[in-house]
UniProtKB/Swiss-Prot annotation:
Superkingdom, taxonomy of origin: Bacteria
Pfam name, any one: DUF179
NCBIfam families xref list: PRK00228.1-1
Gene Ontology CC: cytosol
Family: Belongs to the UPF0301 (AlgH) family.
Disulphide-bridged cysteine pairs: none
Residues annotated as signal peptide: none
Protein name from the UniProt record: UPF0301 protein Tgr7_2910
């Protein structure tokens, strides 16, 4: 992997032909990418769960506002493990900065703060993550499974989930509805 092919803080946009149900029409935010592989969170597949449901399961008291925060299917790996993508704010016990504008946290303290309305302004809560072994992501990109573009905080945190796939591709000037699912190499 060269420095120019590091996809940390990038969106991975599934091509229309990618039919794996875990990634069909997905946008994945890449949290870490190095010579050992990559880790990301799918940001446009909300589940039927809300933050309130997760907090209740963890015996953390919350109010009705937590029922308004969706929980996303972050990927097929460790689907019982929670991840919070958020704007940098607070000092959580298990945070990893991804970029100047985004951190990922896996500790209970951020959820407790969110239940008290003391958490970060921008959040995306997910269960599970997407993972790739060494060289796997690079090969999938070379095989036309994915497009990549620098992450955008509005798409990540504010745009409705059902608009994120097209919006991320539009950052590249691509209209995914015009691309065949059978794309290949010329």
């Amino acid at each position: 992997m060269t420095a120019s092919s590091n996809f940390t803080n990038q969106f991975l946009i599934a091509m229309p032909g990618l039919e794996d149900p875990n990634f069909f029409h997905s946008v994945t935010y890449i949290c870490e990418h190095n010579e050992q592989g990559a880790m990301g969170i799918v940001i446009n597949q909300p589940t039927d769960l809300t933050l309130k449901t997760v907090l209740e399961h963890m015996d953390i008291e919350s109010d009705a506002k937590a029922a308004e925060i969706p929980v996303f299917h972050g990927g097929p790996v460790q689907t019982d493990r929670g991840f919070v993508l958020h704007s940098p704010a607070g000092a959580w016990s298990s945070s990893m900065p991804v970029s100047e504008g985004v951190q990922v946290t896996t500790s209970r303290d951020i959820l407790e703060a969110m239940a008290r309305h003391e958490g970060p302004k921008d959040v995306l809560v997910a269960l599970g993550y997407a993972g790739w072994g060494a060289g796997q992501l690079e090969q999938e990109i070379a095989d036309n499974a994915w497009l990549t573009t620098p992450a955008d905080l509005d798409i990540l945190f504010r745009l409705p989930p059902d608009q994120r796939w097209q919006a991320a591709a539009a950052r590249l000037g691509v209209d995914l509805s015009l691309i065949s699912g059978d794309a290949g190499h010329a």
